Design a protein with these regions (language model features):
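Classical eukaryotic N-terminal signal peptides for Sec-dependent ER targeting/secretion
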Residues: 1-22
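Residue-level marker for the onset of beta-strands and adjacent loop->beta junctions
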Residues: 4-5, 98, 106, 146, ...
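N-terminal signal peptide
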Residues: 23-47
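Extracellular leucine-rich repeat
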Residues: 39, 49-83, 87-97, 101-105, ...
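Glycine-centric low-complexity/flexibility signal
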Residues: 53-56, 60, 64-86, 131-279, ...
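Small-residue (G/S/T/A) turn/hinge positions that recur once per unit in extracellular repeat modules
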Residues: 87, 93-95, 100-102, 108-109, ...
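Leucine-rich solenoid repeat scaffolds
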Residues: 163, 291, 301-331
Length: 331
């Protein structure tokens, strides 16, 4: 993966912000993977103008669709942990999940010790937790899966902790998949269109696109996977996978780590997958983490995904950086 350049956002305002809503629309792809854009304050108007342009009707108040079902998990059995999910479950060593993933619920807390990873490296594999207590990721702790949905009183990602759904998307929505047609190695689409290096007769490069934009109706509660990049071969699939989905819901989120839903890279024979979806909802959020739902690189870049951050109040300490590749980052 290419170089990541974190960009600090302006310092938080020195007062309580009322229901600060940051909607990040990840823009159209060019030859490069498309970058994410965080909109704040005045820039928010611009974001909404895009919606108007697309004849968009506002969604009902955020209703949280249930994550895909997965079998109920136990602390010792599924997570190799110590304790139980109705009091406190501590996972001391890394675990590789089998099957479709895990659904974790209980009245207790969950803690991944420093450096521990919970991995389910299959497209669309679910790691879902809904706990009354806390969820804590120690330093360098990781969760890797296609759909990661965590709800708890507090969620804490320690330094260098990572939630990574890169290229692990399950199936995109039915009607408009965003997956490019043909064998031109085009990029997948989602928040933006994928790029294409193939120019149709009578069209210019600027008019040539890969996969389509989709999922306009869930801008505030994005829940779509990114789509796959195209291939240059009918026999072999060289396209990068789409980015997955990450949802985090808590009263307080401490984000010192990284949340990633990037599309996969397609290499020289396939298009990049498009970015997936990230939705964070909290009363307060602090820390200095990174959030990324970029399209993957490839013969043609994948479109960006969607990021929605719905935070009532940002702690004085909260700062966030964006990490997409491409020259756009230097803007
Ligand atoms: C969890 O807490 C709720 C509400 O306090 C209670 O009704 C439920 O029985 C508890 N569940 C367990 C497994 O302790
Ligand atoms: C978590 O579980 C509670 C109680 O079962 C439920 O009310 C709530 O909607 C769940 N939250 C999410 C995000 O699924
Ligand atoms: C969540 O965090 C708050 C503020 O740091 C703390 O007061 C509270 O006890 C935490 N909740 C739990 C369940 O640990
Ligand atoms: C998060 O980062 C802040 C600032 O560096 C630090 O004060 C805090 O202890 C960190 N928290 C965790 C859980 O790593």
């Amino acid at each position: 993966m290419a170089h990541h350049i974190p960009l600090p956002l302006p310092l938080p305002l020195r007062r309580r912000l009322h229901h600060l809503f940051i909607l990040a629309l990840l823009a159209v792809a060019s030859g490069n993977p498309s970058p994410g854009v965080y909109d704040r304050g005045a820039e928010e108007a611009e974001a909404y103008s895009i919606l108007t342009f697309h004849d968009y009707t506002p969604p009902p108040p955020p209703a949280l669709p249930p994550p895909p079902a997965a079998p109920a998990a136990t602390c010792a059995g599924d997570l190799g942990g110590v304790g139980d999910l109705d009091t406190r479950c501590v996972v001391p060593v890394s675990v590789r999940l089998e099957g479709g993933g895990v659904f974790i619920s209980g009245n207790g807390s969950l803690q991944l010790l420093d450096g521990v990873s919970v991995t389910c490296q299959r497209p669309g594999c679910v790691v879902s937790a809904n706990l009354s207590g806390d969820i804590r990721f120690g330093h360098g702790a990781r969760v890797v899966a296609g759909w990661v949905s965590l709800a708890a009183t507090n969620i804490t990602l320690g330094d260098d902790a990572v939630i990574d759904t890169t290229a692990l998307a399950g199936n995109p929505p039915d009607k408009t998949s965003g997956v490019p047609t043909g064998i031109y190695g085009d990029g997948g689409g989602h928040g933006g269109r994928g790029a294409s290096c193939y120019v149709n007769k009578g069209q210019t490069q600027e008019d040539s696109w890969g996969g389509d934009t989709y999922a306009w109706s869930e801008l505030k509660t994005p829940n779509s996977y990114g789509s796959k990049g195209g291939s240059t071969s009918v026999e072999k699939d060289y396209g990068g996978g789409g980015g997955g989905v990450v949802w985090l819901f808590a009263d307080e989120i401490v984000m010192n780590g990284t949340v990633i839903a990037n599309g996969g890279n397609g290499g020289t024979k396939g298009g990049g997958g498009s970015g997936g979806s990230i939705y964070l909802k909290a009363a307060t959020m602090q820390g200095g983490g990174k959030i990324s739902a970029c399209g993957g690189n490839g013969l043609s870049g994948g479109g960006g995904g969607r990021v929605s951050i719905d935070v009532f109040s940002r702690g004085e300490e909260f700062r966030m950086s964006r990490q997409c590749r491409s020259s756009w980052d230097t803007l």
